[in-house]
Amino acid sequence: MRHQRVDAGGEHMNGVYEALKRTESGERRRGEAPAADDGATRDEGAAGGIRPAPRYGVGPALIAGNDRYGAVNDRFRVLSARLQALAAERDRHLFAVTSALAGEGKSFVALNLAVSLAQNGVRVLLIDTDLRTPSLHWSLRLNPLHGLLSYLTERIDFESSMQATALPGLTLIPAAAAPSAPELFACPRMHKLIAAARAAYARDYVVIDCPPALAAPETQIVARLADALVMVIAANRTPRHAVARALDQLAGCEIAGLVLNRFEPSYSRKAEYG
């Protein structure tokens, strides 16, 4: 199986610039397999309208907390520690995760970041807003029919959209696959969901898995509703100009962290998953 690496970068724009330089090889070398987008679960109980945790297993993309992937776990701990510092210093609690293009592993990063945060004893709400290719429900073995889409179309309320997972502290609002509908994210209902998430997790964390920035105009809407943004870049796959375009489209969003997926510098210690 293909071995991959994750590297958590800095929050400042010079970190973004260095990452852009590292992706230059991606303009000449393509074809890398995308990161797996399946994962795991935590149990928060059924109180407050949250659906009971399932009794299913854990998907292969969940590596946070698995000793087999120690070095990669360390990268997620670094990233989660950075976000916790932002929460303490600047009152940032709601983070959007995206990438420039599809297949860069942003759902993998969102899932494992959420789990890494929850392992610190806080509650985490993970929201899948990628209606084009939703994956978190599959990773966590949950039913996507009662989630974001049902909420946005006014079929259920906020509490009913949340589903407890098999991992303590982690709750998911899943997404069912649907055609592109940016207007759903621009409606007052989406703003109401974010406001409800902020109120319910005011002392904890919300992680939003957004669609790829260059593929979905709704990402600009969702990212601007968040406190800060985590950008995922496939180091040997994503063209530099694509990352630059994505950052231009998301101008004004605070960069909370940079994740280089499949990051393979010769000086880095090896960290494998697959």
Give short role names for the model-derived ranges.
Residues 50-81, 85-88, 99-104, 122-202, ...:
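P-loop/Walker-type NTP enzyme "switch/lid" segment
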Residues 19, 129-131, 210, 262:
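Generic detector of well-ordered alpha-helical packing
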Residues 112, 116, 138-139:
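Active-site signature of alpha/beta-hydrolase-fold catalytic machinery across serine-
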Residues 183-274:
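Conserved catalytic-core segment of NTP-binding enzymes
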Residues 109:
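Hydrophobic positions on the alpha1 helix immediately C-terminal to the Walker A/P-loop
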Residues 91-95:
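Pre-Walker A (Motif I) flank of P-loop NTPase domains
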Residues 20-27, 83-87, 117, 121, ...:
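Conserved NTP-handling cores and scaffolds of large molecular machines
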Residues 2-77, 241-274:
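C-terminal lobe/tail of nucleotide-utilizing enzymes
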